[in-house]
Amino acid sequence: MSTFDNAIADRPIGLTAPSGIDRAAHHRLDEAWLAAAWSHPTTRVFVVSGGQVLIDDTAEGGTEIVMTPAFEAPITETHRYFLGTDEDGVSYFALQKDSLPGRMDQPARPAGLREAGLLLGPRDAGLMAHAVALENWQRLHRFCSRCGERTVIAAAGHIRRCPACGAEHYPRTDPAVIMLVTDEKDRALLGRQVHWPEGRFSTLAGFVEPGESIEQSVAREVFEEAGVTVGEVEYVASQPWPFPSSLMLGFMARATSSEINVDGEEIEEARWFSREDLTAAFESGEILPPYGISIAARLIELWYGKPLPKPGSIG
């Protein structure tokens, strides 16, 4: 298999492009520095709630997260997360709250990461992904896995510490492989999960299991879901996927067999597509492409040779 010259880095989407933010982890335990940063007039803060933030589609530079000066934002009974600093020295924080604030003085609307990740620039998309991932982790890991006692937030949102036994718990990231498989005829293997809308096809994917390399995981997942064996595996790119805590590792893989036998549990249907087959299926509305924010769309585009149609623009 040849190396792809038009790598994802050449056409990054919001969650794969460099954000320009230095996460500055060395400041997370420095309470004096955090307090000074919070009171600095350039520091900006936004609210995250239920995986959503407020965005402004009318901003001069394009869609942006609605942020306010940190010193104007009350922090009582909220979780405050330090997200990092930019090249100009501006610090960014997120506040986790039960609901998003009302904004009557400017255009704003709530949006989740699947939508906002396509609209926001790299800086704001990266900040939102960081904040949403921390919010999900905080929500799901409130108790100590060692002794069962309630934990408290530390390190500006990046540690949960157990006062009872002293254990420290860190945000988890679950590695998952996602791969576009091609055969000797250069056809692409796409599948449809049981719970997806009718006609939605995408790449195969699955979690890496304990004691397994990512290459082994690619081969296992493809065989389990579609009954196809693979040989050569080529890493392409990664993407954070905080729904709630995955890191998607993107691959191209070459099949060594072509007979499909779906598992019927995760994958309901799988098919080989030539580029001509896929174009015809898109144009007829038979097939719906994966959502644009997903690295799946970029993997398919690397093989397809051009952008996929946007969902809702076909059929």
Residue ranges and their predicted role:
Residues 1-141, 152, 196-201, 263-315:
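Nudix hydrolase/Nudix homology domain
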Residues 130-180:
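Cys/His-rich short segments
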Residues 160-202, 207, 229-230, 253:
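N-terminal strand-loop-strand
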Residues 167-170, 239-246:
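Acidic pyrophosphate-coordinating catalytic loop
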Residues 202-237, 251, 257-259:
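The catalytic Nudix box helix
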Residues 247-270:
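Non-heme Fe(II)/2-oxoglutarate
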